Amino acid sequence: MKFTVSSSSLLSLLATTGKVISNKNTLPILDYFLMELKGSELKVTTSDLETTLSGSITVDAVGSEGTIAAPAKLMLDSLKEFPELPLEIEVNDQNWEIRINWKSGKLSIPGASAVSYPAVPALSAEHREITLDVDTLIGGINKTIFATADDELRPVMNGVYINFAPQLLTFVGTDAHKLVKYEAKTETDLTASFILPKKPANLLRSVLLREEEAITVGFDSKNAVFKLKNHTLVCRLIEGNYPNYNAVIPTANPNKVLVDRIELVNGIKRVAVCSNPTTNLIRMDIGENRINLTAQDIDFSVSANETISSSYDGQEITIGFKSTFLVEILANIETPTVQIELADSTRAGVFKPVYDDEQRSTTLMLLMPMMINA
């Protein structure tokens, strides 16, 4: 195995695929990059047995093809120290030594045989397949992933639920305290769903930022495959039935507030400094053209209050929210103005972005209230 490659191109590929590698691998070989050279294409694969990511680049001056397992940390640490320059990489097929040569020096890294590297799971013959544009997939993941849980007892809530329906694609994330539903119009007639784990969802976010072409998504009952231009991600899906999220979204919300999002976020942050550190409770008294924010910590005799101007249609209402969740919800809405819909102090608040024109997607965020002590 022998070829020449740009140092920056190789580092970029290894850094991206290296995000899969776990700090607690059960198999020593999983601490390695699987590097395969066929023709002028260098393919690099990493896996943690649950998620597998591969990427490829074009290399020059190919002397011979081959496959090797290269130690991930050593390869990354070495390549980070190089400026942009051509590297000649040669592998000794007898002892798996990896030699990296450049204009003014060389280094040697011990590799390993790739024979024991785990095979990539294959989809069943009954798998489904769909093509999605980058903006739809990255938009759905970005909007919902922050609301997913870390709950060993309810693993189905630890991922992003993706539901395909005729002309509509829905992404949902929830941890039982907050819920986000993102819907986008599509041109598919597919009816299916799966739960994407958090780790591959985050990996897709980072890889998709550099993609422009459409993505092919294939899946069966156990695994999903995301095929991009230069990368392929294969992951095991979360098994189980996702909660009926539509049942918890209140539909009759007569009280509606329009408020400047940044002004509200900044007000919450200032007032929340004086909230109880255990509950982070912040009280919202909503009335005509104003939202009054209050927080206090009785144990330390501290309190804060601020009034935010708003446009309000409804009855006066008092409701409590966890300030950290409230800030998180508002931080994931990108419009200058946000609409808050409320039924009463015991039901969830619904948060929606306010757009100036019609959108191909809609976002709904829900936050459960907290009890306010009289």
What is each stretch, according to the model?
Residues 1-374:
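Structural preference for solvent-exposed beta-strand-turn elements
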